[in-house]
């Protein structure tokens, strides 16, 4: 058995995943949903698709994160780790003002079926470890 890294390419061999943002991004209810379909199904048939019953990534008031959405997946330099990049707000005030959203990144994990586990949006002040395979610099 050769060790292998899990990536989004592995996911697409078995099923297609479409992450989408829902609700208005000026509301605390802006969130991410998920559509899935078997990769061998008739993708033009609406019955081939399953929609998550609940958002798969949503506000986390305990971490002062409101309206997370518009995520994309980013691999570490050596593709052994994966991250999501998204934007959100840290306060409920001024929700209807379009500025005030900040860009965030956090590491994700994978379940036994190769589906990304997005986790809970972290506090804006959460520190991350350097991604796996990050080159070191000779500069001081």
Task: Give the location of each predicted region.
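Histidine-centered active-site/metal-ligand motif
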Residues: 1, 70, 87
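Single conserved hydrophobic/aromatic residue that forms the stacking wall/gate
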Residues: 1-8, 12
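Beta-propeller and closely related beta-sheet repeat lectin domains
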Residues: 6, 69-72
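Beta-rich carbohydrate-recognition and catalytic domains
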Residues: 13-16, 21-63, 77-82, 87-140
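Repeat-based blade/solenoid architectures
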Residues: 65-67
